Amino acid sequence: MTSHPVFIDLSLDEQVQELRKYFKKLGAEISSEKSNKGVEDDLHKIIGVCDVCFKDGEPSQIDGILNSIVSIMITIPLDRGENIVLAYCEKMTKAPNLPLGKVCLQSLWRLFNNLDTASPLRYHVYYHLVQVAKQCEQVLEVFSGVDQLKSQFANCPPSSEQMQKLYRLLHDVTKDTNLELSSKVMIELLGTYTADNACVAREDAMKCIVTALADPNTFLLDPLLSLKPVRFLEGDLIHDLLSIFVSEKLPAYVQFYEDHREFVNSQGLNHEQNMKKMRLLTFMQLAESSPEMTFETLTKELQINEDEVEPFVIEVLKTKLVRARLDQANQKVHISSTMHRTFGAPQWEQLRDLLQAWKENLSTVREGLTSVSSAQLDLARSQKLIH
């Protein structure tokens, strides 16, 4: 979302006077005279009634009024501005319809970008900004990812408690439209806990697991097990279910669902979607150890009919998690490579061996090229001597 600098070609006193007159004319309970206590008191009074303009007026006109209020707010010293900014943010969340909601969103974004980047007030503005963006269905306009979020607060990082509150809000506003982004947010949330307070993050940890399991684009789930709040769930059903998705095959999930059907459903997880994901994860695990698989093997391991094998493999290839070739004539699948479901010591050793082999091959190639180059130089010298 773009934002333009705030600039009003009037003095503060003139702006305050005009705003008071404007809101009084709309029927607000406010004096048209300036306060003797100063501009902060004027702002408190103006912000207290500013939502009266939501009842009438065009969005463009209201945007101009709010812009004027913002232009005054950003002049208030930090130590006296917190209550004013918070009051304004609360008013912006009360827009009665979508067009005005977008006006309020733009106003908050303008305020956010015109506050000093080192101001702790930016956190409060951004929190309300996300709330309004949800109302307007424009969350991705103000939040595109965790890296972007952190860069916004690089000069004044919020406290761990503030970030936890913000991450919970971001999870809530993205979970219905972007599960992948929502899952990343929850992982970041759990990363804010330490060994000392991880035990109080039970609810957050459960939400994180459920979001990751429900996301059709999240397949590498092993890192969740290392998060401290998730470790505190060991022995709980949700942790058992996560462990199945991390390293077990389809039959283990089927058995878990038969034994704990109500639990799975109570978490808002879709059984058919779980089956689809577990089939893909099972296929990946089989591909790790079997460079070649028959259709018959896949029908048994994945619990599908033979005529479903080809469509299934095609869907797997679309994810780019596995590289393979279908051999319809011989009813086989030839595996070229696959992403590992877990990446532990064996995988690091395998990677080390692969890199070592590459190093040796490159050394051989370099030696060969050196020999060829030397031979060519010798030949050139000999020909020169002959002539």
Curated annotation (Swiss-Prot):
Record keyword Ubl conjugation present: no
Chief location of this protein within or outside the cell: cytoplasm
Q: Which UniProt keywords apply?
A: Cytoplasm, Golgi apparatus, Initiation factor, Protein biosynthesis
Q: Known InterPro entries for this protein?
A: COPS7/eIF3m, eIF3m, eIF3m_C_helix, PCI_dom, WH_DNA-bd_sf
- Name the domain of life: Eukaryota
Q: Which GO terms describe its molecular function?
A: caspase binding; cysteine-type endopeptidase activator activity; translation initiation factor activity; translation initiation factor binding
Disulfide bridge map:
none
What Pfam families does the record point to? Answer: eIF3m_C_helix (PF18005), PCI (PF01399)
**UniProt GO cellular component terms:** cytosol; eukaryotic 43S preinitiation complex; eukaryotic 48S preinitiation complex; eukaryotic translation initiation factor 3 complex; eukaryotic translation initiation factor 3 complex, eIF3m; Golgi apparatus; investment cone
Q: Which HAMAP family match?
A: eIF3m (MF_03012)
What does the protein in this record do? Component of the eukaryotic translation initiation factor 3 (eIF-3) complex, which is involved in protein synthesis of a specialized repertoire of mRNAs and, together with other initiation factors, stimulates binding of mRNA and methionyl-tRNAi to the 40S ribosome. The eIF-3 complex specifically targets and initiates translation of a subset of mRNAs involved in cell proliferation (Potential).
Q: What is this protein called?
A: Eukaryotic translation initiation factor 3 subunit M
The record lists the organism as Drosophila melanogaster
